[in-house]
Amino acid sequence: MAIASQYNAKKVEDKWYDYWMKNNYFHSEVDDREPYTIVIPPPNVTGVLHMGHMLNNTIQDVLVRRARLKGLNACWVPGTDHASIATEAKVVAKLKAEGIDKNDLTREEFLQHAWEWTHKHGGIILQQLKHLGASCDWERTKFTMDDDMSASVIKVFVDLYEKGLVYRGYRMVNWDPQAKTTLSDEEVNYEERNGKLYHLKYKIDGTEDYLTIATTRPETILGDTAICINPNDERFTHLKGKKAIVPICNRTIPIIEDEYVDMEFGTGCLKVTPAHDENDKNLGDKHDLDVIDIFNDDATLNNYGLHYEGKDRFVVRAEIVEELELYGFLDKVEDHINKVGTSERTGAVIEPKLSDQWFLKMKEMAQPAIKAVLGDDINLVPEKFLNTYRHWMENVRDWNISRQLWWGHQIPAYFYGKGKNDFVVAETLNQAVLKAREVTGNAELQASDLTQDKDALDTWFSSWLWPMSVFNGILEPENKEIEYYYPTNDLVTAPEILFFWVARMIMAGYEYRGERPFKNVYLTGIVRDKQRRKMSKSLGNSPDPLGLIEQYGADGVRVGMLLSSPAGNDLMFDEDLCKQGSGFTNKIWNAFRLVKGWEISEKIEQPETAKMAINWYTARFQKTIREIEDHYSKYRISDALMSTYKLIWDDYCSWFLEMVKPGYGEPMDAKTYKAIIAILEENLKILHPFMPFVTEEIWQEITERTPEEALIIAKWPVEKEFDETIIKEFSHAAEVIAGVRKIRKDKNISFKNEIDFSVLNNENTSKTFDGVISKMGNISNLEYVTGSVDGALSFRVRSNEYFIPIAGAIDVEAEKEKIQEELNYTEGFLKSVDKKLSNERFVNNAPEKVVAIEKAKKADAEAKIEALKASLKSLS
């Protein structure tokens, strides 16, 4: 069957992905081989493929395919995350578009809509990953809301509660007024914004005097319950024991003393609003102050907001400033740079809010996780993230794990009374009934008497169990799969979730398995555009990944992504990289077509040039294999690709095939051809992890194969000793061939015309590749001489000199004139360099590196002048 003249990526990709799936190559079962396990960072169930996913999953697929080739039992577990906040927001928006308010639905009715949405839109991203070539074990696909996954989450919550690590507390939390839920500290992004500092006047009760406070949030004065001064501040001695009156609401509040107050900030007087600032809450607890919450869940003002009730906080800010000014309570307004917290999920400005929430104590759980990473039990790649990790973990705060959402794992706390502590925690309702009966002493208590906590658990509370729960390691901690596949080998993820997810998985691993969840954490960079901007929908600078695959092929896009993606460093994405990857695909395909197009003869002896070429490439291949293995061991995936790329493009296509190809219209000997095919197959093996489709296509085109002989499960090349000498010898020969080609090109000497060639072998260079030089330079006669050759052009390679007689081939006088011009220019250049180097001030004061460069220029110019003079002499 004829080989297609052009590579059809779409056709090839569909064909081989279906073939791999049909033959179950991606599936893993427990056996006696060494396992290699990766769990996918589960994308949001309703998400779609973006460039970050492309990079992350390409790297994972490279690692998994290489492990498979190395004979390991490769298991890559895919799945999706239920993404409470994001998914609920989408469902609420959908319902709103249909004229349905979430608040008009029961929880069960809302969840029915959420599940319908998830079934309709969920998992699209996993299908998209198949277009990339991801070789996940799709039979193992998990979803964080699967029954067994949910049961694992609930079991862990109950266990941690019984250990005293999970508790319910009335705390200041981060409130997202758009999503109407709490967020953990790690889900809040802080940014500096230009704002205002308002100086407000509070009347001192019983006098006509005023004190002034400075605040960035004048709307919160309606929740003030004290003014605080520093007891050491002599300016306010007269205020001790007095009271102040809050403007607008006319509430009388005490003036308290506490050294917490910074005497240098603002006016030195601090308004205390315990419901809306964590530090104020601490002061309030210390001084037994009232707590007045002025906000509704959507950050509009409630009835404590008086005539501002129902208005948004920022609208109220503007209006209350006008009112304060109108009644003479506004002293002045200053520009002020303020640090503002925003929701990572919605972008809304976070509102500190007091609320009953569930928390997980982290300090104790963090200790083994700190030790594991700092003690090299777990490796972070690159290591630059170690300090970030250590800082986070050593300053860890209790994790707020409850969210005011319906979509997610409902907290398994059941209330049997109206008191805050009238609850039991249990895995099931039936167990809760039994516990509640025991606690209350009421044997008649029924399930209908219990009310389950309405809140859901933070999404991360399910995904922190991911490496264990995908193998059912929580519900059945001794099952054969968790014992075999856990701990996993590598985790490939983004640095921005190093604490959100990675650190928490490590904590969970030590808590529930007593060991690490993975050995290595490869932290990818952020995909940015050429202007270094993060790719985003809002900027419109993110290309459609599937569109790129359609245009350049999956292999081309994979190569393009990896060519510039060193671990932990941001990738400056340029579509030209995908174009380069596509060009590489075509290069490989055309090289294969060239090889398959040769006529083979069993009667011809193997030429010595072919034998040398095979020996050289075999050594070069083995040297590259060592480089590649070293890169892989250090997770320098981009470097491993580049080594492979150069080997195949430069050494195989540009040199090796040219060295062995037969003359025009002539057949090739069978022995050489067999070696060429064997070499090609080895090339395909090391290239397969990066470019799975084109390599499988060529592998299957070489000869008919059974499913057991597919490239995807072939054997990775074995490292062997290699001849370094032959590599060095060919390196010299390649420079000689390049010199011959340059002269042919510069002097318009057709390659069809044979030339004589003389060598002044000052270096006593080996003659190993003389036959190759003759073949690739179309040299009729190669001889060694002891002196310069008259009437010849010459060039140097290191200290050797090479001569090509040009009698009758070129216009000698014109050539002499050209050489003289180049000689004059080079001598002038040398004078300018000498002048610089003779300047003692320059030599003594310039950086050593700069002086060294100038000296190198001088040496190069002198060598060139000598060669040009020799060429002139030979033409005389």
From Swiss-Prot:
Ranges in coiled-coil conformation? 847-876
Location of the motif 'HIGH' region: 43-53
Position of motif 'KMSKS' region? 534-538
Where does the record say this protein resides? Answer: Cytoplasm
Q: Where does ATP bind?
A: 537
Q: How does it assemble?
A: Monomer.
Name of protein: Valine--tRNA ligase
